[in-house]
Amino acid sequence: ASDVYKRQLMHRGISPKVLRYCVGSGILYQTTRGNYRNCVFVGKDENGVPRSAFQRGCQGSFRGDVAGSQKQYGFLIPAEIETCDTVEIYEAPIDAMSGATLRQYKHDAPWRSVHYLALGGLNHQPIDYFLQQHPEVKRVALCFDRDEPGRNFTKIVAKRLTERGYIVQDTPPAIGKDYNDYLLAARRLISMER
C-alpha cells in the first residue's frame, strides 16, 4: 500500500527512472490520512530545505498547496551539470516529470541535460527565484498547457523574459492539453508501432 503513489504516477506514464530520482532526492513522497493517499511534490530552497509542497490525491481530483508553502519555491528536477544553461518550465509537477520522461524516451540527450521547473500553477514567483539562483541559465522553454490560461501566460512570460535578455522558446505540448496528455499519447503510439 505504501507505493500507491508510485503506481499511480507510473499509470500516468512517468518512467521508473524519473520516479526513483524524485523520491530519492526527497522532492516526491506519499502521505496517508485514513483511506486517503496524496502525492506530495516538494519545492526546496538553494540550501535544499523544503519550503513549499503541493498535494495531489492518488485517487480522485483532490489537489492543493500544503499550509505555509512559500510559492516562490517551485518543484525542481535540476540538471545533472551545474553549468546547464537551459530550463524547461511547466505548470504542474506531473507535467515536468512527463517532460523528463519524454526526453528519456527520445534518447536525444541524457534526461537530466536540462532543468525541469514546475510552478504549481500560473505563477511568476518560482520563475524569478529560479533565474536569480541560476545566473548561468540563458535559455528558457515555456511548456505551459495548451489551453487559454496557459497560452495567455506564455505570452506574458515570454515578453518579460525576452526583455530581460533570455532566449525564450514556446513549446506547448504537441498533443493534448498538457505534457502528461502528450506523454500518454506518445506511449500509445510507441506501443502501437511495436
Task: Annotate each language-model stretch with its function.
Residues 1-5:
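Short, small-residue-biased leader/transition segments that mark boundaries at the very start
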Residues 30-133:
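Phosphate-handling DNA/RNA-contact segment within nucleic-acid enzymes
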Residues 6, 96, 158:
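Short glycine-/small-residue-rich flexible loop motifs, especially phosphate/cofactor-binding loops
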Residues 6-34:
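Electropositive nucleic-acid engagement tracts
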Residues 85, 101-194:
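TOPRIM fold recognition
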Residues 8-12, 44, 102, 182:
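Generic structural signal for bulky hydrophobic/aromatic residues embedded
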Residues 15-16, 26, 68, 134, ...:
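Helix N-terminus capping/helix-initiation residues
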Residues 27, 74-76, 178-183:
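Residue-level preference for alpha-helix termini and adjacent loops
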